[in-house]
Every structure is written in C-alpha cells, then in structure tokens.
C-alpha cells in the first residue's frame, strides 16, 4: 500500500477570503458540494473568481452541487436566496441558471445530473474550463 502523506499537504481555509495560492498555479480544482455551503451568491462569485485566479490557462473547475430537483429543496427554514436550513445545517441549492451565472471567465463543458446516496440526493456535476 502506498503512503501519500509526503505528497499531500492539507491546509484549512476560510473560502470566503483570498486563497493562499499563487496565480495560475493549478491545472484543476475539484470540490464536492463546497458551493452548497451557507454562502451567499456574492460569496459564490468571489470563490469562483479565486478559483479562476489560481487556475492556469485552460484549467478546469470541477464541482458538484445539490440541485433544485433534490427532495430537500424548499424544505426547512428559508435562509435567503436558494438556501434552506434543516436540522441545524444550511444547504445552498442550484438551478442550471445559477450554475451558468458563475461562468465569468469560464466556458461550461458540461452539467451532468446524478443521484447520490439512498435518499437519493440530486446533484449536478459541473465542468468549467478557464478561457
């Protein structure tokens, strides 16, 4: 079994602030449901621009989000925009239009809907390429 400890550096960030990364440093950024956290639309635009900043030309921003087809969408306490709180946890849900509104500087390659888990959760896998 390979030990990857020497190859992986784990750091904690407040993603609402500038990332401690050089410009055009990465070929790709992947996040699973990060954009679904309790982030405002402006926070999401700012995060997207930070990802744009750290990606190399033609780099990819690949992410998953819960979408409006999810069974929990519009359940719980509405917290503004497309955010709903259930059991003390806020989830930001995405329409295809909201995904496309985050394309500043990117070209969308694909938006693929899929199910996750036994509920199941309804997610979208988004692949965007930096222009």
Where do the language-model regions lie?
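Class I (Rossmann-like) S-adenosyl-L-methionine-dependent methyltransferase catalytic domain
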Residues: 1-18, 46, 60-131
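Short conserved AdoMet
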Residues: 39, 56, 104
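Surface-exposed loop/turn positions
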Residues: 25, 58-59
């Amino acid at each position: 079994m390979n030990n990857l400890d020497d190859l992986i550096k784990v750091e904690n960030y407040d993603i609402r602030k500038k990332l401690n990364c050089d410009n055009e440093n990465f070929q790709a950024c992947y996040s699973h449901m990060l954009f679904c956290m309790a982030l405002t639309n402006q926070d999401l635009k700012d995060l997207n621009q930070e990802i744009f900043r750290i990606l190399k030309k033609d780099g990819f921003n690949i992410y998953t989000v819960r979408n409006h087809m999810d069974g929990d969408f519009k359940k719980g306490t509405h917290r503004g925009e497309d955010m709903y709180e259930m059991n003390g946890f806020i989830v930001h849900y995405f329409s295809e239009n909201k995904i496309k509104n985050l394309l500043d500087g990117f070209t969308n390659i694909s938006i693929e809907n899929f199910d996750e888990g036994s509920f199941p959760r309804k997610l979208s896998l988004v692949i965007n390429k930096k222009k």
